Amino acid sequence: MLKIGEFIYPWGSGHYSRMMRLNAIMGDYIKEKFEVHFSSKDHVYHKLLEKFPDHKDQIHQILMPTPIDGKFGPSILLSLINLLLPVSKNPPLVKQVTSYLREESKLYDKEKFDLVINDGDMGSNIIAKNRQIPSLFITNQFRPKLYRSRSYFYPALIFVSKQIEKASRILVADSPPPYTMCEYNLNFTKDVKEKVTYVGHFTTSVNIEKKAISDLEKLVENSEFGYWMRTGNRSTNDGTGQRYEQVFHQNEMKNEK
């Protein structure tokens, strides 16, 4: 039996949503019998337990390091302090990384995965590379373009991209060029482009039954409109919501729907 390890980064809900969509259709493409093991922490771990109550032995809690929450998303200052000092019940990041990689390595030793799929989890990506296990890395960013005022982040971005490119194949959750929405977050190097596949937005293909037109549909009918998907962590979503509220209450927006 083919054994697949799926490692889901627990920051926000986007990684979980994408992996569940992929997991739902894998049986259409993998013809031999297979078993999936999931790994994550916090709310994602509990969602997995609720979704797969009969497979709890295949759901593993791995304490993957995540940024420290601020008022409007991750706090850069607190996250930097957390590199060497404990913050908000989080041990120093150096200790977290060591512990989490050790736990993931033990899981690899125990389960003997034939294929690994990582959505946001670079640690597992590195382990798979070192053990010569075929791996997929799902992402919508590689080396994002930054404002000059944020150029000090480039060393970290280069480090992260180096870990992502260790995957056997990189799956971009977006449409291929020239219709790529997240193109400014990618900027793949020439040697990496050969292993990149654009796989779409992981949207559901379930047919929606047509019902009576809702008030929302009436509001946007025959109008140009946009929407925002809020799939980040709670503080990021709250901060984004507050900013949108401020914009929508400005005088320039009075005549807008």
What are these regions (language model features)?
Residues 7-11, 18, 173-179, 199-256:
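Active-site donor-nucleotide binding/catalytic segment of nucleotide-sugar enzymes
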Residues 15-27:
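Short amphipathic alpha-helix
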Residues 35-41, 171-174, 257:
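Short internal beta-strands
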Residues 44-47, 116-131:
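An aromatic- and histidine-rich active-site surface loop
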Residues 77-118, 122:
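Conserved nucleotide-sugar donor-binding subdomain of glycosyltransferases
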Residues 114-115, 169, 225-226:
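Structural motif
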